[in-house]
């Protein structure tokens, strides 16, 4: 059962990490509306969710190398979920979307595959579908939110912070690296013009991310 206040289940941890990827470090607190919503869905307190997200932060090289730190007491199951996500971002992004949809509709997660049908089937970005809720859209939205949160909603080259003009750009093109298509560390938050320049090879990055 996903909804439980006992020991953390793997499904709860997946949903927590899924949310962690989409929030900047400064918003990992119990007053965050998104944390409150997840807490309500899975039967946890907002404080418990916030603490778990900060536990995940202790495993995040991007956080640790910046001089910040999490709580440092991540469990073995926390680490297992972390590794699973990094091994298959697409699969876990879809699975978490299914879990969230199931909880939000009041169904058990096991029934979601039938409720949604093929709309969230694991498929390539090349697969075309006319359904409103598609795997492609789920993946794209996850990657965009994860990348923008990593860069605190600002273009990493110009500092522009207007969301409507920001693009989550892939460092290694998605067509060339299927494994890391949804990996936030393979993304740059760029303004539309910088994204276009980067895509056309007018701007390049060195291995240490110098322009």
Question: Which residue stretches match the model-derived regions?
Answer:
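Short, Lys/Arg-enriched anionic-surface-contact patches
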Residues: 2-22, 134
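Short helix->loop/beta-hairpin flanking segments within DNA-binding domains
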Residues: 20-30
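Short Lys/Arg-enriched helix C-cap and helix-to-coil transition segments
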Residues: 61-81
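Short, charged surface segments at domain edges that flank catalytic/cofactor-binding sites
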Residues: 115-160, 172-185
């Amino acid at each position: 059962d996903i909804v439980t206040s006992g020991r953390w289940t793997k499904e709860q941890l997946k949903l927590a990490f899924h949310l962690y990827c989409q929030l900047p470090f400064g918003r990992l607190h119990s007053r965050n509306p998104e944390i409150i919503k997840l807490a309500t869905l899975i039967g946890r307190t907002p404080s418990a969710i916030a603490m778990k997200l900060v536990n995940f932060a202790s495993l995040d090289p991007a956080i640790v190398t910046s001089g910040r730190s999490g709580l440092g007491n991540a469990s073995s199951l926390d680490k297992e979920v972390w590794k699973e996500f990094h091994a298959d971002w697409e699969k876990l992004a879809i699975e978490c979307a299914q879990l969230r949809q199931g909880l939000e509709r009041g169904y058990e997660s096991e029934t979601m595959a039938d409720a949604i049908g093929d709309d969230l089937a694991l498929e390539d970005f090349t697969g075309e579908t006319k359904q409103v809720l598609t795997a492609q859209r789920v993946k794209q939205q996850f990657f965009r939110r994860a990348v923008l949160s990593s860069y605190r909603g600002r273009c990493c080259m110009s500092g522009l912070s207007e969301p409507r003009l920001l693009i989550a750009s892939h460092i290694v093109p998605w067509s060339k690296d299927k494994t890391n298509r949804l990996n936030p560390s393979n993304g740059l938050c760029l303004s539309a013009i910088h994204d276009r320049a980067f895509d056309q090879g007018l701007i390049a990055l060195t291995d240490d991310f110098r322009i």
